[in-house]
Amino acid sequence: MDKIFEQLDGLLDRYEELQELMSDPEVISDTKRYLALSKEEGGMRDVVAAYKKYKQVLSDIKESEEVLRESKDDDMEALAKEDLEDLQKQKADLEDQIKVLMLPKDPNDDKNIIMEIRGAAGGDEASLFAGDLLNMYMHYAERQGWKTEIIDATPTEVGGYKEVVVMITGDNVYSKLKYENGAHRVQRVPVTESAGRVHTSTATVGVMPEYDEVDLKIDPKDIRTDVYRSSGAGGQHVNKTSSAVRMTHIPSGIVVSMQDERSQQENRARAMQILRSRVYDYYETQNQEKYDQNRKNAIGTGDRSERIRTYNYPQNRVTDHRIGLTLNKLDRIMNGELDEIIDALIVHDQAQKMESLNV
């Protein structure tokens, strides 16, 4: 904990400095600066509170140890021992809490997300499972008090999706759903299977933080926009006007097509929304090869052997292969009860980060 204490003392000094700055009338009148300082202060608040409590516990431990050394009263000594035992437990708990709070923060954790779900290996059954995953995430979002909106979809004749893109907005969406990146495998008897045999299919999930113009400004000269006639929903209207939009970010080669909205203006806005997130994702890697690999890891090739989680319907079982977690409540999970899986993934991620920091 010594290295952490060095950081904590500096953090405490900075926190107190921020408190002073935020009460300065000159700073208060500068909205942009005040908001920036407020955000910094908010990011420190929990760890500073835990550290102050920790310092108080250390002081109480020292006091109890002095009582034990100097006491000649058996009752007083017994009481001090009891207090000391309780304080040592508090100290250990606070050390664990502080370690977690001091882990590097993902700057995207508080962002909304754009989620892409694709039916992959398994034909019609894979497209149906893509629809099931969409429903699962939408139910989970509802439980979290988040909002969902389907912004692009390619439905299949059997009622599933070849691809569907959904935007999920709310508090800390990315922090919880970023672990859903990868290939999801389903084992079940398809509705079209007369012999009752279990088939294996795959759907892939990609999760990107939603970025806005503050995060990334794209030069309009770097975007080529093509318009064409939509073949999607919207009745005869779509055949009379070129409302569909295809945007290409020339430096990266990233392409986004959008035709689900009724007007070209709406399709442009939606396409730009997705394009900005993909381009930011690209520049985060600063390397086309890394970008391609990340997209492959996120969206997946759809191969049956590539998976992060398996959903076994006959046995009502879900297994997350990354952490070896198996839960026999598939029916509840598909209804949006994902908390147990996501919480376990967060704990696993934190443990790995702690190990890498050797704290």
Curated annotation (Swiss-Prot):
Residues that bear N5-methylglutamine: Q236
Species lineage: Bacteria, Bacillati, Bacillota, Bacilli, Lactobacillales
Pfam families: PCRF, RF-1
Keywords: Cytoplasm, Methylation, Protein biosynthesis
UniProt keyword annotation of Protein biosynthesis present: yes
GO molecular function annotation: translation release factor activity, codon specific
PTM entry text: Methylated by PrmC. Methylation increases the termination efficiency of RF1.
Source species: Lacticaseibacillus paracasei (strain ATCC 334 / BCRC 17002 / CCUG 31169 / CIP 107868 / KCTC 3260 / NRRL B-441) (Lactobacillus paracasei)
Location in or out of the cell: Cytoplasm
Record family assignment: Belongs to the prokaryotic/mitochondrial release factor family.
Gene Ontology CC, one term: cytoplasm
SMART domains from the UniProt entry: PCRF
Gene that encodes it: prfA
Positions of transmembrane segments: none
Function: Peptide chain release factor 1 directs the termination of translation in response to the peptide chain termination codons UAG and UAA.
Name used for this protein in its record: Peptide chain release factor 1
